[in-house]
Amino acid sequence: MKNEFSIKFNFPDGILGFEEIKEFIIKDSEYKPFSIMQSINGEINFLVTSPFNFLEKYLPNIEEKDWLDVQAENEDEKVILCIINMHVKTYKEITANLKAPIILNKKKLIGKQAISTNEEHYLRYRVFKE
């Protein structure tokens, strides 16, 4: 059995489309730099990664209220992830949702899906394309 790193986060508001799911585990994936964000019951899985892995100058313009909702006041508590989509037809196009990032307080283990107010961010930003 391989070692697997995972952390449980509480999402008081759930995430968009899955508001009823309040707890997710974020765990390592064998496909770096991606991680898996999985509901506690294991029924819902998302592939996630830091947007800074592919977009060095990502500026999401997240509202201060959103950071307060996850009780993150200091920069060292804040983590931003984005949900990754692999398009089923070819699996060759990978996009990231930059418009609605997952924000986390890594110390208090609280998360939320926020909305970026930066007009340059799209729901389907091409991360990789063959």
Swiss-Prot record:
Main localization (coarse): cytoplasm
Entries under Pfam families matching the protein: FliW
Localization in the cell: Cytoplasm
InterPro entries associated with the record: Flagellar_assembly_factor_FliW, Flagellar_assmbl_FliW_dom_sf
Gene Ontology annotations of biological process type: bacterial-type flagellum assembly; regulation of translation
Chaperone found in the keyword field: yes
Alphabetized UniProt keyword annotations: Bacterial flagellum biogenesis, Chaperone, Cytoplasm, Translation regulation
GO cellular component term of the entry, any: cytoplasm
PANTHER family reported in the protein's UniProt record: FLAGELLAR ASSEMBLY FACTOR FLIW
Family label: Belongs to the FliW family.
Self-association and partners: Interacts with translational regulator CsrA and flagellin(s).
Function: Acts as an anti-CsrA protein, binds CsrA and prevents it from repressing translation of its target genes, one of which is flagellin. Binds to flagellin and participates in the assembly of the flagellum.
HAMAP family noted in UniProt: FliW (MF_01185)
UniProt-recorded name of the protein: Flagellar assembly factor FliW
Organism: Borrelia hermsii (strain HS1 / DAH)
Upper taxonomic lineage: Bacteria, Pseudomonadati, Spirochaetota, Spirochaetia, Spirochaetales
